[in-house]
């Protein structure tokens, strides 16, 4: 009961008209991946776009707060590196290859440029701590001037509160 009240106060649902575009079509969770196509990779996003599916992608913060498209908090599963992505500088993450030759970990700006409004994109901000401001600001800046349909979500209610208090 108290948790739901806090969620409602910190992260109220958006007006239905603002998110209506999210309904009525399939979404590829982390892009359309599998059988030689790695999740949250440019190839997974291109496969989803080809089928007209919207895209859900995950965003993590580098040490400096910049937004990278990567699901896991740790690098181990999808790269040959170990440890948390949040402990690395953007310049270092730019050099990390995804496993099996799937390119580098993309920055959110690169993914938005690739999608280029061809399908809607749902950006999930992943944050395990209370310091969400730098990552939220990075996402907002990446979305400035983006011509396509996009929405931001998070399971951390502080993210929704940040966007409510700091503009859309």
Give the role of each language-model region.
Residues 1-168:
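Phosphate-group recognition and catalysis centered on beta-loop-alpha active-site segments
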């Amino acid at each position: 009961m108290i948790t739901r009240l806090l969620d409602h106060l910190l992260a109220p649902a958006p007006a239905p008209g603002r998110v209506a575009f999210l309904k009525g079509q399939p979404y590829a969770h982390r892009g359309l991946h599998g059988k030689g196509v790695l999740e949250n990779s440019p190839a997974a996003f291109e496969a989803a776009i080809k089928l007209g599916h919207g895209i859900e992608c995950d965003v993590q913060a580098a040490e400096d707060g910049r937004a990278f498209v990567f699901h896991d908090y740790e690098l181990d599963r999808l790269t040959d590196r170990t440890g948390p992505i949040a402990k690395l500088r953007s310049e270092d993450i730019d050099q990390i290859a995804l496993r099996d030759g799937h390119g580098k970990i993309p920055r959110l700006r690169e993914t938005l440029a690739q999608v280029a409004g061809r399908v809607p994109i749902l950006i999930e901000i992943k944050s395990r701590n209370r310091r969400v401001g730098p990552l939220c600001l990075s996402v907002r800046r990446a979305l400035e001037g983006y011509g396509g349909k996009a929405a931001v979500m998070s399971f951390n209610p502080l993210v929704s509160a940040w966007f409510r208090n700091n503009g859309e």
